[in-house]
Amino acid sequence: MKKVEKKDNFKKFKNDNIYKKDDKNINQELINEEKKIKNFNSSNNESSNEKKILFDIEMNITVELGKSKVKIKDLLNFSKGSMLFLQRKKEDPLKVFANNKLIALGEIVFSNNKYGIRIISINNSLNGINTSV
C-alpha cells in the first residue's frame, strides 16, 4: 500500500464547466418555480385557512459559500491546516436556497458574534407570491 504524504498546500482547481452548467439548471428551476407560484396564487381552491397553515411550515435555509472539485487522492491528503480553494470570488454574491431551491443572492455579514446574510436580490419567482390570507 502506498504511503500518503500530508500536504498543506493545494492548487486552486479550475472548473469553468460548473458555472455554465449550474446557470442553465438555475434558470430552468426558476422558470418552473415561477409557474408553480402563479398557479398557487391564481387557484380559487386555496382557502384562507389552508394558506395560513402553509405559511407556518418551516423550511431549511442554506447559504452556499462556494464549490470545488478535488480528486480523491487530494481529498485523502487533507489534514488540519489544509486549504481548499473555492471557485467563488470574494466579491461574488452567495446563493441562498430554501429547501434546495435558489431563492436569493446575498452577502455575508457579522453581527452580535454571529454570521448572517444580507439579501441583495430576490428571485423574481418569490416577488409574485401573494402572502395575504
From Swiss-Prot:
Record membrane topology: Peripheral membrane protein
Localization in the cell: Cell membrane; Bacterial flagellum basal body
GO biological process, any: chemotaxis
Record SUPFAM superfamilies: Surface presentation of antigens (SPOA)
Xref: Pfam families: FliMN_C
GO molecular function, one term: cytoskeletal motor activity
Family of this protein: Belongs to the FliN/MopA/SpaO family.
Described function: FliN is one of three proteins (FliG, FliN, FliM) that form the rotor-mounted switch complex (C ring), located at the base of the basal body. This complex interacts with the CheY and CheZ chemotaxis proteins, in addition to contacting components of the motor that determine the direction of flagellar rotation.
Protein name: Flagellar motor switch protein FliN
Lineage of producing organism: Bacteria, Pseudomonadati, Pseudomonadota, Gammaproteobacteria, Enterobacterales
